[in-house]
Each structure stands twice: as structure tokens, then as C-alpha cells.
A protein has these predicted regions:
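ATP-dependent helicase/translocase motor core
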Residues: 1-26, 30-172, 177, 181-197, ...
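Functional beta-strand-loop-alpha-helix junction segments that form "active/interaction loops"
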Residues: 197-212
Length: 248
């Protein structure tokens, strides 16, 4: 965590992080058997709040205490719930398509893994999209990797074949930037999806006889290109309406 003056905050560690189907479900605070199992519970709850995790367990190997951040209370339990039980307590009963979308893994390349806040941002956007939310707003500070986060969202929606209508096909996604340099930087971030990408530019539209390119799934453009060719793009959207799951 970065602080003012280019300093870094204290690093936090959890004893155990329980994950299932690419989803972080619970934190376990483990103590020796001669210690009070509730020692450190509040600290783990604080960690869970930062990591957007819904369940915390505190144990000394003899007793187990469960705290649910969903319900806002805790209780002693005889045994841990199964991973599937925790998953269903978090998401409820969901259909296979939604589960595929919200559990699809991140794209990992060259040993680069998303930071915890990037994971949270991506996961929340994915969950909202999978549950048919029409609009999702992510507010992120400078230097937090906004383009990387956008790539991970697009990659997971694309690979899991998420669609607003629930059909089994990849979505069409529009990435908008306000400057060409930002658009170019974004395209570089999306290099692993290169074969599925097309740029929408005035030059490209003129080259195609006034037609907007549609032979791709992920489109990159700047606002000016969209504004200058608004009528043609609207016509293309109408013509392609059966195939388009959404523009973003």
C-alpha cells in the first residue's frame, strides 16, 4: 500500500486464505491449542473487509468460531463447511453460465499476477456483469493499473462467453479512450487477444467504403472517431443487433 511521500504502508499477512473455483472465500486465523481461539479474530475481520472476503474462522485446533461478514455476526461451529457450501452461501444458487463467468481464471503471463485491489475491482465488475447490471463504475487512482484491470475484465468476459442474453457466444466489446496514445497503450496491454481486435478509425471506415469494421469481437476507438461517424455506427449497430450483446 503506497502512502504520501512515496512511502509504503505496513504489509499484512493472513494465516490461511481459503480459495475455491478461483474465488477467495474465507480467512482462517490459527492459534496454538493453549491459546484463546478468539485472539486475533478482529484483526482477521479487518483483513477480510479490506479483501472483500465474507467469512472468517478463528481456531486453536480444538474450537472453531465462524464470523460471517454477510450476516454481521458469529457463532461456534463443530466443523468447517465444505468449499461448495461456502460458495453457495456467498453467491446463492446460480446457473452454470453465471458460475462459469464469475469463476473464470485471470490471465497470467510472465509471472505477473494482479494485486489484491486489482483482483477485487475485476471480480466485482465481473459479478455485476454476470448478474445483468447495465452499468458498472470503477473509481481508481492514478498508477493502480486501470488498463490492466480493464484487460482482465474483458478477457474473462470474453473467454467465458458472457452475453447479456445468456447465449453461448463471445460478446462484442468496445474500448473507448479520449486520446490516441491511450488507445495505443491499451491495445499493447491486450496483445494476447490480438487476433480478436480491430481499431475503429475514420481512416479505417473510409477505407471500407464508409462501413464500420465488424469483423472482430473487441473494438478500440477514441471518442472523436465515434462522434465523427455516429450515424454510420448507429446504422451498423442496428444491422448487427442480433449478434451484439452490448457496447461498453
Amino acid at each position: 500500500r503506497k502512502l504520501i511521500g512515496n512511502k509504503r504502508g505496513k504489509r499484512y499477512f493472513v494465516d490461511y486464505l481459503l480459495s475455491f473455483k478461483n474465488t477467495n472465500l474465507a480467512i482462517v486465523e490459527a492459534k496454538a491449542d493453549d491459546k484463546d481461539p478468539l485472539d486475533g479474530l478482529q484483526q482477521s475481520i479487518n483483513y477480510a473487509q479490506k479483501l472483500k472476503i465474507d467469512f472468517v474462522y478463528a481456531t486453536n485446533g480444538l474450537k472453531i468460531f465462524e464470523h460471517s461478514l454477510i450476516e454481521g455476526n458469529g457463532k461456534w461451529i463443530d466443523s468447517y463447511p465444505t468449499p461448495q457450501e461456502l460458495f453457495e452461501r456467498k453467491f446463492g444458487k446460480i446457473d452454470t453460465k453465471v458460475e462459469t463467468t464469475i469463476t473464470y481464471p485471470f490471465h497470467l503471463e510472465d509471472g505477473m499476477k494482479p494485486r489484491f485491489y486489482q483482483q477485487i475491482a475485476v471480480q466485482k465488475a465481473i459479478e455485476a456483469s454476470a448478474n445483468n447490471k447495465d452499468r458498472v463504475l470503477l473509481t481508481l487512482a492514478t498508477g493502480t493499473g486501470k488498463t490492466y484491470i480493464a484487460f482482465q475484465i474483458v478477457y474473462r468476459l470474453f473467454q467465458s462467453k458472457w452475453n447479456k442474453d445468456g447465449s453461448n457466444r463471445r460478446p462484442k466489446i468496445l474500448f473507448l479512450a479520449d486520446r490516441n496514445i491511450l488507445k495505443s497503450q491499451a491495445i499493447n496491454q491486450f496483445n494476447s487477444m490480438e487476433k480478436d481486435i480491430v481499431e475503429i478509425t475514420g481512416k479505417e471506415i473510409r477505407k471500407r467504403g464508409g462501413k464500420v469494421p465488424t469483423n472482430a469481437n473487441v473494438f478500440f476507438a477514441i471518442y472523436q472517431s465515434i462522434a465523427e461517424n455516429k450515424k454510420q455506427i448507429e446504422k451498423t449497430q442496428e444491422d448487427e443487433e442480433d449478434d451484439v450483446s452490448g457496447y461498453y
